[in-house]
Amino acid sequence: MIPSYDPNDTEAGLKLLEDLTTNAEAIQQQVLHQILSQNSGTQYLRAFLDGEADKNQQSFKNKVPVVNYDDVKPFIQRIADGESSDIVSAQPITELLTSSGTSAGKPKLMPSTAEELERKTFFYSMLVPIMNKYVDGLDEGKGMYLLFIKPEIKTPSGLMARPVLTSYYKSQHFRNRPFNKYNVYTSPDQTILCQDSKQSMYCQLLCGLVQRSHVLRVGAVFASAFLRAVKFLEDHYKELCADIRTGTVTSWITDSSCRDSVLSILNGPNQELADEIESECAEKSWEGILRRIWPKAKYVEVIVTGSMAQYIPTLEFYSGGLPLVSTMYASSECYFGINLNPLCDPADVSYTLLPNMAYFEFLPVDDKSHEEIHFATHSNTDDDDDALKEDLIVNLVNVEVGQYYEIVITTFTGLYRYRVGDILKVTGFHNKAPQFRFVQRRNVVLSIDTDKTSEEDLLNAVTQAKLNHLQHPSSLLLTEYTSYADTSSIPGHYVLFWELKPRHSNDPPKLDDKTMEDCCSEVEDCLDYVYRRCRNRDKSIGPLEIRVVSLGTFDSLMDFCVSQGSSLNQYKTPRCVKSGGALEILDSRVIGRFFSKRVPQWEPLGLDS
């Protein structure tokens, strides 16, 4: 089920894409047949299929329940603790992928196999012919793609647990990839695989600057990471230019493989190049800086869908009119689809699901609230509601244009009818394969980078801060709160709006700086593993801020929401605001601003059950 072709042959790649999307229904049936043939004897599926490789789609749906992570966590944890892979997979589980989502504050673990890396390599290869279809001459230069690895964790079984991109970059599929004239990087692999993210960033930018005349596209995986690179360049351009001018690498780059690989690219002093770059970077405005430094660049490749859409205005400011290209939709659980119209407006990005990547089903959701249509999952059944309404679950080729769905996957690696949590809207079809716009991650209210903070996570953290710091000795009541992700600066940070009042009067609250700063720190301490990693290790999120607003502010917010069409009877304070008008009301009534003064603790540990 893993096709192959010469990635240097654009026409062959486009033909393969046509074949896959034209035969989507048959391929989906083959995928399910293969998964069940391989894995029907696993402990997990035996409980539902009695060891029979029942390959009929409807029978599979009748017998195997739709599940979420809490349902499958015990099975995956047993593998992490050293039990056999055949709990969920006939193929050996070779690693566990850490999701950006968390369960009980710890990263979710997704099983993966050696074969799955081959499937991902195929997926990446399909991106190249699509770009070649729309952009000429990509074989005449290089891409400055800023790619990074993150910490790994060794589980009791000996299996490594790591983010999906770290898994791919460290694999032989990436490190020993065959030459592809359309996909040559400015960054040596040694700089991508550097454990120190700051050294990695510096070295990759230095290589991209030295090779500026060869750079035809720039980018990173996520918009947030690319903007951190722009900010890093702004902070370090003088040092970078000094290295180019002298043909040396600054002394604080201590990773020897990084130093050696970068020195080979520097290849001696270049006064003229250093002066050109420094002149551009010294300009008062950095508007259009990407086009000015890399004048041959044809586009910026970053994911700008979902929570990354908040970075589009900033990217447009720096890009100088370069198209923003969002090529793919993938997660730790599965690689899903690709953008067949990569030069479209970022707001119009849709992904075409590749039918050979997994078996896909879709749970309809309400198009207004994005709440699930009434049904029961395996872990949440009532006596009167314990039967899954099978007619609501839709196959890949049977989704309807304009409808919203949550994607449900059955993978080759041991996830069966698993709810990913992504809400998608069907925008059309390419041949028989549907195209989806990513709408949102279910239950997520705040996200800056790879963090995903839910309303429940936020409530628990705010409650803890309130109990530990507001009741004594300050005697303040937190009457209401909301939040938003502030990306006006780099890195972005969480902002909480709190309305406080004294317990024993209606006077304006007296705000003690240390108390409020402790509240900021307490909230951060209570947020999950991924948030704390982003703050502590990755430095991709700035210190959390609390803005205290005057009494009555949330009444004004309610009035505004009702004036915009919300029902007064059903109004609930939004726990995250995105409307410009709502933010204006909140910001206009701020009476105090406080930031966390310390970085929350984070250790790459704690995956035990």
Swiss-Prot record:
GO biological process: response to auxin
GO cellular component, as recorded: cytoplasm; nucleus
Keywords in alphabetical order: Ligase
Induction entry: Not induced by auxin.
GO molecular function: indole-3-acetic acid amido synthetase activity
Task performed by this protein: Catalyzes the synthesis of indole-3-acetic acid (IAA)-amino acid conjugates, providing a mechanism for the plant to cope with the presence of excess auxin. Strongly reactive with Glu, Gln, Trp, Asp, Ala, Leu, Phe, Gly, Tyr, Met, Ile and Val. Appears to favor Glu over Asp while the other GH3 favor Asp over Glu. Little or no product formation with His, Ser, Thr, Arg, Lys, or Cys. Also active on pyruvic and butyric acid analogs of IAA, PAA and the synthetic auxin naphthaleneacetic acid (NAA).
Family label: Belongs to the IAA-amido conjugating enzyme family.
PANTHER family attached to this UniProt entry: GH3 DOMAIN-CONTAINING PROTEIN, INDOLE-3-ACETIC ACID-AMIDO SYNTHETASE GH3.17
Protein name (Swiss-Prot/TrEMBL): Indole-3-acetic acid-amido synthetase GH3.17
